[in-house]
């Protein structure tokens, strides 16, 4: 039987072999930052939740602009992304909101925000420069704008899609590229990331089936972050599913370098997920540790006999080597 710890070890080791110095595919023009700095000041949010909800409202506004063909402005997003990318502490706090948002029926806006949060955490592990973090964050927020043009009758359908409906969804990378084309002169990585985020390392992705170094690293990061987000949240047609296949070393869909950073920065067990420990207790993941994807902090909910635990009891697996997760 293959153990999670073996899969993790193999994935991390293969990532190190691919860790030659790499940088984002697109150079970031100075004008991107100078214009953002001249933008009107954004009102300071009252809480981390307000930061998340402000982004959610912006994404809903962009969605409305696309559907109503009235256009949209990405300048406010630049400022919001800059604030988040420039504060690892804020990013970590927002990370905890990814479990609270993303399961609602209309998930498109929260999917984009959660993907940005995961992508930035991956890029921090890869030691991206501040300007590259900002550029990646904006690309991640806008990576799925092509989906905004897909009718809700398809997006929110609880049954399997018809071939025609599935094809409409499958065309969203091209739609995203075309939607972001007006910014290609100043920010070419936006359209590129939207177009490539479903391409896979082994060439099995779409729309072009390109592979390896043909795919920009922004798209590789966003693609993995987007996949993880979708797998760990409910959708109209299914419940959230296991993420084990993401780290299976037989799955060569994702860049080893990016996968390694993902595993070192984001726990195998998502925040809020239920896990069974080797002492047969059941708990919920309430905190994770960078670089320790198998050792989260768990709030115990049921004892070994299945009885609810009344008191607030948490176990930090990082400091308890005799305890480990046996199932999730």
Model-flagged regions — what are they?
Residues 1-75:
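Membrane-cytosol interface segments
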Residues 47-328:
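Histidine- and acidic-residue-rich, metal-dependent catalytic cores
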């Amino acid at each position: 039987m293959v153990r999670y710890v073996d899969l993790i070890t193999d994935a991390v080791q293969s990532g190190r072999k691919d860790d030659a110095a790499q940088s984002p595919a697109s150079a970031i023009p100075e004008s991107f930052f100078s214009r953002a700095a001249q933008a009107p000041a954004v009102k300071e949010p009252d809480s981390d939740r307000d930061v998340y909800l402000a982004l959610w409202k912006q994404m809903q506004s962009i969605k409305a602009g696309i559907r109503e063909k009235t256009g949209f402005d990405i300048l406010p997003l630049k400022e919001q992304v800059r604030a988040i990318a420039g504060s690892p502490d804020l990013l970590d706090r927002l990370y905890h909101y990814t479990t609270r948002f993303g399961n609602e029926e209309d998930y498109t806006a929260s999917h984009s925000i959660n993907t940005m949060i995961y992508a930035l955490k991956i890029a921090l592990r890869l030691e991206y420069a501040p300007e590259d973090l900002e550029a990646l964050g904006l690309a991640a927020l806008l990576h799925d704008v092509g989906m905004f043009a897909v009718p809700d009758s398809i997006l929110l359908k609880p049954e399997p899609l018809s071939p025609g409906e599935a094809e409409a969804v499958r065309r969203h990378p091209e739609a995203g590229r075309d939607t972001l084309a007006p910014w290609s002169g100043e920010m070419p990585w936006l359209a590129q990331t939207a177009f490539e985020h479903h391409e896979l390392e082994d060439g099995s992705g779409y729309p072009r089936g390109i592979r390896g170094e043909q795919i920009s690293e922004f798209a590789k990061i966003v693609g993995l972050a987007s996949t993880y987000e979708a797998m760990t949240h409910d959708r109209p047609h299914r419940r959230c599913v296991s993420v084990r296949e993401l780290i299976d070393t037989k799955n060569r869909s994702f860049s080893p370098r990016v996968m390694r950073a993902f595993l070192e920065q984001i726990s195998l067990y998502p925040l809020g997920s239920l896990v069974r420990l080797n002492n047969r207790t059941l708990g919920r993941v309430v905190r994770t540790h960078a670089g320790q994807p198998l050792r989260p902090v768990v709030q115990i909910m049921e004892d070994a006999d299945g009885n609810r635990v009344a008191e607030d009891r948490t176990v930090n697996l990082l400091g308890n080597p005799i305890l480990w997760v046996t199932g999730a």
